[in-house]
Amino acid sequence: ALAAARLITPKHKIISIFQPHRYSRLRDLFNDFCSCFNDADHVFLLDVYSAGEEPIENFESTDLEIGLSKYGHKNVSYIKDKKTLMKTILKLAQPNDLIICLGAGSITKIANKLEDDLYYECRNI
């Protein structure tokens, strides 16, 4: 998805918001996740959507933040508070930037709220 996004918007920022789904999936695909965000200019990580699973040691979103940095990503941030995420995105995003929300769980609610907030911001410019 991010490689395709880069093709359609080569001159603008790609901002990725990722909510890992399940601790076991994060563990099983950890190295893949660490290397798959390289086409994004900024990556914001949310808490793992557990889907009923217990946390697995060393496989939290903060661990993924460290992993992405080790794989060379320069702009990766774990953000626990959704309100802070919204404020950060609203300050960062510019016209024609692409914001991609990835994951399962409550990420769809965040995407819908972000869309509403950005629409409101643009109308008041």
Walk through the language-model features, giving the residues of each.
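ATP-dependent carboxylate-amine ligase
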Residues: 1-125
